[in-house]
Amino acid sequence: GGNSNVCIGDEAGRSLTTGDNNIAIGHEALYSENAHGQNIAIGYRALKAQDGGAEVQNTAIGYLAGQAIDLGRENVLVGGNAGDALTHADYNVAIGNGSLGADTLGHKSTAVGYATLNAQNFTSSTDSNNTAVGYFAGVAVTTGVNNTLIGSLAGDALTEGGNNTALGIRSLGADTLGSRNTAIGYNTLLVQNFASATNSYNVAMGHDAGRAITTGIFNTLIGSLAGDALSDADTNVAIGASALTTDTLGSKSTAVGHSALEAQNFASATTTHNTAVGADSGKAISTGTTNSTFGSSSGAALTTGTHNVLIGSYAGAGGVGNLTTGLRNILIGHGAGQNNGNDNGNIAIGYETNCQGHAEAIVLGGNVDSVANTTFTFGRNDGSDRVHNNYTSNATFTRVSDERYKKEIQNNTDCGLDFINELRTVTFKFKAKSEIPNTLPDYDASKTTADHTGKLYGMIAQEVKAAMATHNITDFGGHSEEESSGIQGVAQSMFIYPLIKAVQELSAQVTALTARVTELEG
């Protein structure tokens, strides 16, 4: 025994007897070891106290590096005073002057940089699983575990906080007792600090993301300046550069996209329930709440409006009457409601549909405007392709019938009394889906009861079609037939015009008969 050892310096490797393959360079380096090998001790009193009970394979380079280790194994300690208090500690890496300088019984720590994990100290055998890389990274950690701190001053105030990840200069730089945080980027979660042990679950990624959070919890902030003004605010999500960048005390906001909810700011603790998804979505909202905006620049002009739903790029924005303070509007489609102004309770669905100057209106179609308050309008474009009704009065639909939109105007001569007399009105009940022919798309053998079981009044579409053929009537909107299934239908309102013609014909007959009776009685 005692082979292949290199010992250079006063008292270096003094106690070695049977240990092999050791290197001891420096005054009292590897002083106490006698029987074990594969150790490297370079520096004044490096590994001086080691006398392990197995092949310990420690490496200590630097003044007093690992000087107190006795039974610890597989440690790598490089730098003046690196790991100089460790005793029964295993699997540690300390590189840098003063790194891991106070711990005695902690295991599995990695400290790289000047004074990293300098205050860590476990009084009983503990797997710390702490990693600190960078000048003063984790310098104040005492008994916190499972921390990963990378960057100068990263997590430099942490003491007992655990399960944190801080990557970037000064990231998580003030917190002492917070746990389960993730801070990635320069100044992320810079001033967060909990006075008592707290699982805050904050995530901040990006330059200055979440830099002003103090005691807020459950926030997810990803992107440069994302949520960078939030302080005591909770359960926010901001993803995108400058998303939710102004707010301080608003909670339960979701901003996804560049500058989404950029201007939102509440001076007192407020549950906002705002959701903005898309670049510049909801970017002007200041104190409006419970808004949902989806699409690039959707709701981009909205400020104090509440309870609005906007879906589609430039929905409620991009026009001459942007939605700013309106309430309870639903705008769906590119540019839908972009001229809505500050009106309330409107529903606009379709490309550039609008309710400008109106309230409680419903618009459906493309590039079509409402005609008045409390109306339902549908169609495409304005003019002859637009149909509307006023559902607070007669609830009937109105379509443009202006003579200026019409040509080839002729008297109706074929769709009158004779046609009406050909029709049969009936009473009936609808069949269950299992009773109709199985060739029809609605057939369902399991549906043995009709959706509506009461008696109804109406006509038979096939009979209407036959009457039309008898009187050579074409292009009559009162009858329709689906091309794919052959299912026929009747539009009851279209029979008003044949009925008017029939009444006129009857009136003429009555007039003639009255004249005849008068003549006969005279």
Label every PLM stretch briefly.
Residues 448-453, 487-491:
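Short, contiguous acidic/charged loop-to-helix segments that flank catalytic cores in large enzymes
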Residues 401-429, 437, 500-522:
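Extracellular receptor-binding modules and their adjoining Ser/Thr/Gly/Asp/Asn-rich linkers
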Residues 433-442, 461-462:
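Glycine- and aromatic-enriched periplasmic loops at the membrane-periplasm interface
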Residues 418, 462, 466, 497-501:
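Feature representing long, continuous alpha-helical segments
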Residues 422-425, 461-474:
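Glycine-rich, acidic and aromatic/proline-enriched surface loops and short helix-turn segments
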Residues 439-451:
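Short, surface-exposed loop/helix-turn segments at secondary-structure junctions
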